[in-house]
A protein has these predicted regions:
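A structural signal for short loop-to-beta-strand junctions that line the ligand-binding cleft
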Residues: 1-25, 53-59, 175-181
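Hinge/lid segment of periplasmic solute-binding proteins
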Residues: 1-17, 32, 41, 47, ...
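A local structural motif
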Residues: 6, 29-32, 109-125, 138, ...
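Short helix-initiation/N-cap motifs at beta->coil->alpha
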Residues: 37-42, 119-135
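Glycine-centered hinge/linker elements that transmit conformational signals in sensory
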Residues: 44-46, 88-122
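Alpha-to-beta junction loops
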Residues: 50-54, 136-144, 161
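Short, solvent-exposed loop/beta-turn-alpha elements that line the ligand-binding surface or hinge
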Residues: 76-100, 154-158, 170-180
Length: 201
């Protein structure tokens, strides 16, 4: 990346947050992949009524995964342009669109138990647990990054169900169209005090 005209690092991998869903299950139930907040909450209620968790996910193995959900809600509710303005200091993180995003995430996560049934379950589950939950219809969907494609395919290898993915829905009227949030997963840099920067390059 470049900042203030200075080159700091080269991208190694690009990743995106996505919403995986059990395509076979959705077709069986006549559910549509949500693109708006109303559709999102409607299908979530239908999933819960069918005795399943809305999303499979957990943080036991890597607690910073909380930032993934925060980022999804900030961008889907406040919009990526507003998030960018906040990142460069042109907006305050206490502005209503950001507060609303976090309040909605709290409602869905704490009050409604969208992730693995409850906040307690979310904190207790690890990578293998929530992948198994998704593959076995314990949950109808999973919010995660594109780095999970291999593990998800392996989890469904012995299943007759098919899985697919879609962008996370827009959570506020007038927000941006559904989009895949692209980010750098890893970067390559050379220590500024390296004795042999050219050789390292």
């Amino acid at each position: 990346g470049v900042f203030n005209g200075e080159f700091y690092s080269a991208p190694k991998t690009f990743e995106s947050m996505i919403m995986l869903y059990n395509k076979t299950l959705f077709e069986e139930k006549g559910w549509s992949v949500p693109t708006t907040l109303a559709e999102y909450e409607d299908v979530a209620n239908k999933i819960k009524a069918a005795g399943m968790n809305v999303f499979a996910y957990g943080s036991t193995g890597w607690q910073p995964t909380h930032e993934h959900l925060v980022g999804m809600y900030l961008n889907s509710y406040a919009g990526p342009n507003n998030v960018y303005k906040a990142l460069i200091g042109e907006k305050d993180w206490t502005d209503p669109e950001f507060v609303g995003a976090i309040e909605l995430l709290r409602k869905h996560m704490v009050d409604d138990g969208y992730w693995s049934g409850s906040l307690e379950n979310y904190y207790a589950l690890g990578w293998d647990d929530f992948h198994a939950m998704f593959a076995s219809r314990g949950a109808a969907m999973m919010t995660i990054g594109t780095w999970t494609f291999g593990a998800t395919a392996a989890g469904f290898a012995d299943s007759s169900d098919e899985w697919d993915w879609a962008p996370f829905p827009v959570l506020r009227d007038g927000g941006a169209d559904p989009a895949y949030l692209l980010a750098l997963g890893t970067t390559m840099s050379i220590n500024a005090s390296s004795a042999n920067p050219d050789a390292a390059a």
